Design a protein with these regions (language model features):
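Replace the tail clause
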Residues: 1-170
């Protein structure tokens, strides 16, 4: 993880044995690298923003067995603070509602899935480019692909020599 709060939460909560026990007893924990799987991060970030009005990392998403998100959040401290519940409180609450109010969880997941699709469709619609003449010929595209293939690092992934870091946004 490259983000500050990801490291903080790892140190405060994930490395704490009592917290890890709660996580491992009641949940199947999956860590997704947002740089390796931006497609998954995109869906889960949409879910978090729809549910909370905010987003960021670390990003925690609770899913149904059908892999539909029903709750999400970002950083949670080890003890209540910063206007947020403790991470173990969140975990215990999610376990309780999933166990005792499964129908409500499923309804929430369905509504959220529908909303995510609507948001993505709206975004796709606004980003559509009107049909025009192709910018490049097939020959030019094939040459570009061949050039990229020649530069691809088969051992480390990506392009160029390792180490590789995400580009800056500025």
């Amino acid at each position: 993880a490259v983000c500050h709060w990801c490291h903080v939460m790892e140190r405060e909560s994930f490395e704490d044995q009592a917290t890890a026990d709660v996580m491992n007893t009641h949940f199947i924990n999956i860590k997704v690298d947002r740089e390796e799987r931006p497609d998954i991060d995109h869906i889960f970030m949409n879910a978090c923003q729809i549910l909370t009005g905010a987003g960021g990392w670390p990003l925690h998403v609770f899913l149904t067995p059908e892999r539909k998100p029903f709750s999400a959040g970002t950083y949670f401290p080890p003890k209540p603070g910063y206007g947020k519940p403790a991470w173990t409180q969140v975990l215990n609450y999610m376990h309780t509602i999933f166990k005792n109010e499964r129908d409500k969880v499923e309804e929430q997941a369905e509504r959220l899935a529908h909303h995510i699709v609507q948001v993505d469709q709206s975004f796709i619609h606004t980003m559509q480019i009107p049909e025009t003449e192709p910018l490049f010929s097939e020959k030019e595209l094939l040459q570009a692909v061949a050039g990229m293939q020649a530069q691809f690092d088969l051992e480390q992934g990506g392009f160029g020599q390792a180490p590789k870091f995400p580009g800056s946004m500025s």
